[in-house]
């Protein structure tokens, strides 16, 4: 995922809204994220249409179930031709290994297996929430680093994490391990419901592999300009 452009989170309720948004980006080769709301509303057809538009896809369904179920789910997802899928690291090593096995079994001959990453802790999770609501006494950063090690041991390609945790993760895993980071905002944007946020430039400085950007692009007055502005900051180039 070297030189990956900002991944746009398509947090829309319908295909119609999604296509109206994407129609603005004529000539752009986009990497987009399809989450639960859009996929559950539109099904695999949304993926087919996005691929016809030339989009690379991160299918963000965060699978978390018993190993056998996750294996079967990933085997089906492997046939969709997406670039990136994920599971929850909290499902444990056996579940993550089963997810990888399912992807390998379901990827059509001659095609590249989708990259598989594990969600460590959601960017909406705070240390206080971890301790008071989830009754996890281990510090937030320690859980993220531990989950990252576990994901690598399970054969996964990387993790979803906060930018602030990436440098700590790279002290514990190999340099080619992917760190995909949501919670990206420009300095003058609102944080909304995410508490561990960062700018594209800060993400670049911390050496993350890819950034995921939603509202800063999708809710901008000029989404194309916002996308390019974020891209320039992410790449460290002048607009």
From Swiss-Prot:
Gene Ontology MF terms: orotidine-5'-phosphate decarboxylase activity
Class of this enzyme: lyase
Reactions mediated catalytically: orotidine 5'-phosphate + H(+) = UMP + CO2
InterPro entries: Aldolase_TIM, OMPdecase, OMPdecase_AS, OMPdecase_bac, OMPdeCOase_dom, RibuloseP-bd_barrel
Keyword Lyase: yes
Active site: 62 (proton donor)
E.C. code: 4.1.1.23
Pathway terms, separated by semicolons: Pyrimidine metabolism; UMP biosynthesis via de novo pathway; UMP from orotate: step 2/2
One GO cellular component term noted in the UniProt record for this chain: cytosol
Amino acids binding substrate: 11, 33, 60-69, 123, 185, 194, 214-215
SUPFAM superfamilies in the cross-refs: Ribulose-phoshate binding barrel
Single biological process term from Gene Ontology: 'de novo' pyrimidine nucleobase biosynthetic process
Top-level taxon: Bacteria
Presence of keyword Magnesium: no
Keyword entries, A-Z: Decarboxylase, Lyase, Pyrimidine biosynthesis
Homology family: Belongs to the OMP decarboxylase family. Type 1 subfamily.
Complex formation: Homodimer.
Role, per record: Catalyzes the decarboxylation of orotidine 5'-monophosphate (OMP) to uridine 5'-monophosphate (UMP).
Cited PANTHER family: OROTIDINE 5'-PHOSPHATE DECARBOXYLASE
Name assigned to this protein: Orotidine 5'-phosphate decarboxylase
Organism (species): Bacillus licheniformis (strain ATCC 14580 / DSM 13 / JCM 2505 / CCUG 7422 / NBRC 12200 / NCIMB 9375 / NCTC 10341 / NRRL NRS-1264 / Gibson 46)
Upper lineage: Bacteria, Bacillati, Bacillota, Bacilli, Bacillales
Gene: pyrF
């Amino acid at each position: 995922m070297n030189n990956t452009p900002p991944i746009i989170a398509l947090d829309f309720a319908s295909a119609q809204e999604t296509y109206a948004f994407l129609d603005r980006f004529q000539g752009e080769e986009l990497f987009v994220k399809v989450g639960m709301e859009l996929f559950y509303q539109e099904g695999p057809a949304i993926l087919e249409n996005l691929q016809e538009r030339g989009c690379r896809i991160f299918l963000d369904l965060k699978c978390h179930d018993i190993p056998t179920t996750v294996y079967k789910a990933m085997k089906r997802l492997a046939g969709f031709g997406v670039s990136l899928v994920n599971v929850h690291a909290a499902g444990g090593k056996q579940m993550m290994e089963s997810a990888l096995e399912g992807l390998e079994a379901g990827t059509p001959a001659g095609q590249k297996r989708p990259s598989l990453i594990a969600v460590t802790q959601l960017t909406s999770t705070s240390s206080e929430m971890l301790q008071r609501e989830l009754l996890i006494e281990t510090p937030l950063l320690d859980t993220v680093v531990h989950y990252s090690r576990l994901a690598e041991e399970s054969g996964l390609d990387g993790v979803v994490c906060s930018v602030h945790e990436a440098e700590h993760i790279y002290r514990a895993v190999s340099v080619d391990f992917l760190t995909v980071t949501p919670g990206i905002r420009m300095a003058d944007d609102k944080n909304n419901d995410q508490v561990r946020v960062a700018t594209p430039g800060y993400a670049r400085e911390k050496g993350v592999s890819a950034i995921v950007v939603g509202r800063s692009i999708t809710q901008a007055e000029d989404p194309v300009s916002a996308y390019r502005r974020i891209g320039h900051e992410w790449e460290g180039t002048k607009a």
